[in-house]
Amino acid sequence: MEFEEQPISSKTVFHGHLIDVEVQQVITPHGNKTQREIVHHAPAIAILALTADNKMILEKQWRAPIAKITLEIPAGKLDQRDDDNALHAAKRELNEETRYEATSLKKISSFYTSVGCMDEYMTLYLATGLKRVSNELPQDQDEQLMLKEITLPQALEMIDQGEIEDAKTIMAIYYWQGMNNRG
């Protein structure tokens, strides 16, 4: 069975600081003409940061697209400082957002965040052996973060209660649960 669509035209309709939006006219495998709206976003990273007493670090912050405060794991997009290196971005974001560095930063997985409309590709890391940084990098001027440390049972309860709704954070928590189940 054929699945691939053939673009016949494309136009960038918005170019922003964080995203670009492209509108494509495509021909489907059945020969139908339709329109696709695609959000282009830089690659990104996220970090499951675990403290020595086995608590995860979360960030409380405002998210304008959903008009509410969220609890999320540290995350950010790759930028020119990272030279397309996701590990470098993870180290940088961990410093900027939490003021920690990790003696171990291990890749867990890479994934597309929302394949129906966006090409953002995120790499999730596990950070352990956390210690306070000696050289603090500048924080993003447009971010207001408050850190919170929680246990795995608290994290699972917060998912059940709808207090944690962010997909990358839920994925990280379930990975953490699996780590504990494997011993």
Language-model regions, residue ranges each:
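Conserved Nudix-box catalytic region and its N-terminal flanking loop in Nudix hydrolases
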Residues: 2, 36, 46, 51, ...
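A short coil-to-beta-strand element that immediately follows conserved catalytic motifs
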Residues: 101-108
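Active-site-adjacent beta-strand/loop module that shapes the phosphate/pyrophosphate-binding cleft
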Residues: 23-30, 114-134
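Conserved hydrophobic/aromatic beta-strand scaffold that supports enzyme active sites
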Residues: 21-23, 48, 58, 124-126, ...
